[in-house]
């Protein structure tokens, strides 16, 4: 009796003998095909370009500032001024007990007189301290970014030097851009990039302190990236926001103008809820915090005062607002149980078993 696999081997024997040769040939063909195809470096180049662009472009979001550059409310503001440098330390994936302990350590630092309650004055002092941390962080980042756009290291950056680096981050050849600028030739850029360049140039000129020389020092470059560090640049940022929101051209803002929905239509109930929250939150912010004289109109001066992160009066108002959110027993102070219960407001993460954990951490 011949086993089936023996019979099969005898029938396919000649072909089986060719198998190693065929495999070798197939491998050679695949290798040639792989080597003939150009390597895909586009994603790598894109990541590098994005990193370079992020290093030299003014950020849309400024930690510790109430409004974004586009006039939207800073949704993370309360967490930023409560956590400071610990902003990234309360991830959803973090171990809950460790997060609760960390939150109670912060509570103890805010509670200067150790009476296990946080007053508005204590919270005000803490907000100012955390805002200063964000300022220091921005200064350190700006120093690094300044070196990236100051290739000759002379301590000054011209608009043309910055323009070369910016367009290089957009994928243009640095040498070709530099040559075109030197020869006063027209640069071919798309409409969107041209618009960004024009806005950046306006901002560059504003950051150039008198006497204007169109060269930015390291300090002026900091103001260019972070307008909250300069009174003049903060005023310029406010002017830009008012210009974007002001619908009747009177250079001030009414409630309807400030709460106007962003461009876009509501397509579903979730979108409607988001838009309803947008209106409610902005109306409350306008009436309770920005419109200081409560006349229904916000001037550029009122908006500038509201956005100034180092304004102690604003810090006190924010402290009172933050306490009011969690002050369940209405004693105008924050207690450990309240901070833990409203941990999502203070840290962005919801910490469970807050009442029991008070005894654990203390």
Curated annotation (Swiss-Prot):
Binding site for Ca(2+) 1: 111, 113, 115, 117, 122
Lineage of producing organism: Eukaryota, Metazoa, Chordata, Craniata, Vertebrata
Listed name of the protein: 45 kDa calcium-binding protein
Cellular compartments per GO CC: bleb; cytoplasm; endoplasmic reticulum; extracellular exosome; Golgi lumen; late endosome; membrane; plasma membrane
Residue positions binding Ca(2+) 6: 327, 329, 331, 333, 338
Superkingdom: Eukaryota
Domain notes: Binds calcium via its EF-hands. Isoform 5 binds calcium.
SUPFAM superfamilies: EF-hand
Described purpose of this protein according to its UniProt entry: May regulate calcium-dependent activities in the endoplasmic reticulum lumen or post-ER compartment.
Modified residues (Phosphothreonine): 193, 217, 265, 299
GO molecular function: calcium ion binding; identical protein binding
InterPro entries in the record: CAB45_EFh (IPR027240), EF-hand-dom_pair (IPR011992), EF_Hand_1_Ca_BS (IPR018247), EF_hand_dom (IPR002048)
Summary of subunit composition and partner proteins: Isoform 5 interacts with STXBP1; the interaction is enhanced in presence of calcium. Isoform 5 interacts with STX3.
